[in-house]
Amino acid sequence: MGFGDLKSPAGLKVLKEFLADKSYIEGYVPSQADVAVFDALSAAPPADLFHALRWYNHIKSYEKQKSSLPGVKKALGNYGPVNIEDTTGSAAKETKEEDDDDIDLFGSDDEEESEDAKRVRDERLAQYEAKKSKKPTLIAKSSILLDVKPWDDETDMGKLEECLRSIQMDGLLWGSSKLVPVGYGIKKLQIQCVVEDDKVGTDVLEEKITAFEDFVQSMDVAAFNKI
């Protein structure tokens, strides 16, 4: 059980595939399992590993609260797919990635390439490019429910919502909203949005929303679901 070496491309690929149908490492809310895996990463995953990057940006938004997240933080080898060897206690093994679609792009290994070998290589390269161009591009999206809290009961909540909806980004679509009482006459704005994971992260949203500091005290992610 484990992800392998999360500082290697192979380990990050395992993490991406593990999170393809999950929002969190365990369960349906952020927990110490997410903290353990997050802390094992040396940096954000690259953009092409969009499931891993989406999860990384979401957990990063809990950085200030990570010590209070539920659960018990365990060793990294206790998380991840069961068919992956835990290499966290030793040097990660180098893995040889399989060629895409089992196509050999390079043909002969001889120093002097024959005309036939060159022709075969060119044909296989053209075949590979043709298959690659036919693969549909999947756009990963997530539905996010945000809780936006004002400073006090005198904050103009209509203006606050207007400020939020003025945030326009490629990959961001605002949805329905409502005011929810929180006590002492104060109401928070609960608003839905849909984002493209590789374009919009919760950390970017939080930065833009809290920039309206005259109206917004804080922003929290109330729910996060992959579409």
Curated annotation (Swiss-Prot):
Region (Disordered) residue spans: 83-120
Modification sites for Phosphoserine: S108
Keywords on record: Elongation factor, Phosphoprotein, Protein biosynthesis
CDD domains on file: EF1B, GST_C_eEF1b_like
Gene3D superfamilies linked: 1.20.1050.130, 3.30.70.60
InterPro entries membership: eEF-1beta-like_sf, EF-1_beta_acid_region_euk, EF1B_bsu/dsu, EF1B_bsu/dsu_GNE, Glutathione-S-Trfase_C_sf, Transl_elong_EF1B/ribsomal_bS6, Transl_elong_EF1B_B/D_CS
GST C-terminal domain segment(s): 2-90
GO MF annotation, one: guanyl-nucleotide exchange factor activity
Gene Ontology annotations for the cellular component aspect, listed alphabetically: cytosol; eukaryotic translation elongation factor 1 complex
Transmembrane segments annotated in the record for this chain: none
Positions with biased composition (Acidic residues): 97-115
Any one of the GO BP annotations: translational elongation
Posttranslational mods: Phosphorylation affects the GDP/GTP exchange rate.
Quaternary structure and interacting proteins, as annotated: EF-1 is composed of 4 subunits: alpha, beta (alpha subunit of the eEF1B subcomplex), delta (beta subunit of the eEF1B subcomplex), and gamma (gamma subunit of the eEF1B subcomplex). Interacts with elongation factor EEF1A1.
Classification via PANTHER family: EF-HAND AND COILED-COIL DOMAIN-CONTAINING FAMILY MEMBER, ELONGATION FACTOR 1-BETA
Similarity-based family: Belongs to the EF-1-beta/EF-1-delta family.
Function according to Swiss-Prot or TrEMBL: Catalytic subunit of the guanine nucleotide exchange factor (GEF) (eEF1B subcomplex) of the eukaryotic elongation factor 1 complex (eEF1). Stimulates the exchange of GDP for GTP on elongation factor 1A (eEF1A), probably by displacing GDP from the nucleotide binding pocket in eEF1A.
Protein name: Elongation factor 1-beta
Source species of the chain: Xenopus laevis
